[in-house]
């Protein structure tokens, strides 16, 4: 595989912000997994321990603390173990049994009735996570997480049926549609406000700009994983859908060209993420919106940092990949054009300017601020701390915002010290 340095330059204008207690988070989640009996094979348990899954959760939420962070980390550890034991090794048969198992697994989490999957450690472990999360979420937040989990399982059924039929995803749009959901990203994104101690109002989460940012985050992380994990998957014989394979088949490219095109594709999506985020984070935006969009950006950077150092992904790409806070020039020549995609092209067609939340007179939780004001730190429920009565719940020690001096295009996302 012949690759130039520029072919492996990942555009990511987000600062690295490690968690000061990351090793403790990782130790606790590994102890939890061991106590739950996942993975079930000693060899897989050794691999899970070596990859240090808790470091990813700690990077995603570098200011989170306490039991809610542990529950968040355990959820990601569960996803890693479940993916390796149930998804990567599927032989493509038993689609009916697979769908039934996932339906029962979701019902165990939804109702707590473990008898639906008696003795299954993954069902019991996920039920444990759900019970702990319910302590920190509102009913709406928990329902949103359960719905994201249902969507993830539905995508896994489609993926298994594709394997059974030896369907190689004939188009890039087929791939994009599958990868928006089969990476379980939405199950994590729905918990970003919970783990950081605030509530993003549902009416803000459903605005076009925020919906687009959520989808971009989910796809960016999945695409980055495809690029960085391709060597592992190609040598282990997995039949997972991978962007490099799709580009190779649809564009008749060499492996090196497929990597270059994949990186160019993700860089274009990253550029659009920055553009939309800059439009969403207006002076009138509530602090919860600032924190949520920053959380999305942190997810993208955390995944890159984790993937480039974990034992889970090793190979020629991870050894040579680099991150750049500056825009990477688009790939010259032919390649995928995401803005023309029927699946994700709408990200480039969001009306501009975006309507201000609450501008139509609706009763929305928007507090107008003067341009240049810092977004106040908000507690659970969305109100600034100085408006709350009683002791506030643990929150970030400071707001996290983009640099307001030069805009997101020219600057990185960084903590705003007070």
From Swiss-Prot:
Substrate binds at residues 179, 232, 312-313. The record marks 80 as: Plays a critical role in the stabilization of intermediate cation. Pathway: Secondary metabolite biosynthesis; terpenoid biosynthesis. Mg(2+) 2 binds at residue 88. Residues 354-418 are annotated as: Disordered. It is an enzyme of class 4 (lyase). Mg(2+) 3 binds at residues 225, 229, 233. Signal peptide: none annotated. Keywords: Lyase, Magnesium, Metal-binding, Plasmid. It catalyses: (2E,6E)-farnesyl diphosphate + H2O = (+)-T-muurolol + diphosphate. Its cofactor is Mg(2+). Residues 402-412 have a biased composition (Polar residues). A motif (DDXXXD motif) lies at residues 83-88. The record marks 84, 159 as: Plays a critical role for substrate recognition. Belongs to the terpene synthase family. The Asp-Asp-Xaa-Xaa-Xaa-Asp (DDXXXD) motif is important for the catalytic activity, presumably through binding to Mg(2+). This is (+)-T-muurolol synthase ((2E,6E)-farnesyl diphosphate cyclizing). It comes from Streptomyces clavuligerus.
């Amino acid at each position: 595989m012949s690759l130039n340095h520029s072919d492996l330059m990942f555009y990511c204008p987000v600062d690295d912000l490690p968690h000061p207690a990351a090793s403790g988070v990782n130790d606790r989640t590994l102890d939890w997994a061991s106590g739950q009996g996942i993975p079930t094979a000693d060899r897989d348990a050794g691999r899970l321990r070596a990859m240090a899954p808790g470091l990813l959760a700690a990077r995603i939420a570098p200011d989170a603390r306490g039991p809610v962070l542990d529950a968040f980390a355990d959820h990601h550890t569960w996803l890693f173990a479940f993916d390796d034991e149930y998804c990567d090794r599927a032989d493509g048969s038993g689609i009916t049994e697979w769908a039934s198992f996932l339906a029962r697994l979701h019902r165990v989490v939804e109702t707590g009735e473990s008898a639906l999957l008696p003795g299954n450690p993954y069902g019991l472990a996920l039920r444990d996570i759900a019970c702990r999360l319910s302590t920190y979420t509102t009913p709406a937040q928990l329902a949103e997480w359960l719905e994201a989990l249902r969507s993830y399982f539905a995508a896994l059924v489609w993926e298994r049926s594709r394997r059974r039929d030896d369907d190689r995803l004939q188009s890039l749009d087929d791939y994009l549609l599958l990868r928006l959901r089969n990476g379980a990203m939405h199950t994590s994104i729905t918990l970003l406000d919970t783990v950081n101690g605030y509530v993003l109002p549902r009416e803000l989460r459903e605005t076009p700009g925020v919906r687009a940012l959520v989808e971009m985050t989910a796809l960016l992380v999945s695409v980055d994983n495809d690029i960085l994990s391709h060597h592992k998957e190609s040598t282990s014989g997995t039949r997972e859908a991978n962007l490099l394979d799709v580009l190779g088949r649809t564009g008749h490219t060499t492996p090196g060209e497929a990597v270059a095109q994949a990186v160019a594709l993700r860089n274009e999506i990253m550029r659009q993420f920055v553009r939309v985020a800059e439009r969403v984070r207006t002076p009138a935006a509530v602090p919860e919106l600032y924190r949520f969009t920053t959380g999305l950006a942190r997810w993208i950077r955390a995944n890159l940092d984790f993937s480039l150092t974990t034992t889970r992904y090793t190979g020629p790409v991870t050894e040579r990949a680099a991150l750049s806070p500056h825009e990477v020039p688009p790939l010259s020549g032919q390649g995928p054009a995401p803005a023309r995609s029927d699946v994700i092209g709408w990200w480039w067609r969001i009306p501009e300017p975006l309507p201000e939340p609450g501008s139509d007179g609706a009763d929305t939780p928007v507090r107008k601020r003067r341009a240049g004001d810092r977004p106040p730190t908000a507690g659970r429920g969305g109100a600034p701390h100085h408006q709350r009565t009683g002791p506030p719940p643990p929150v970030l020690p400071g707001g996290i915002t983009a640099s307001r001096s030069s805009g997101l295009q020219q600057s990185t996302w960084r903590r705003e010290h007070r």
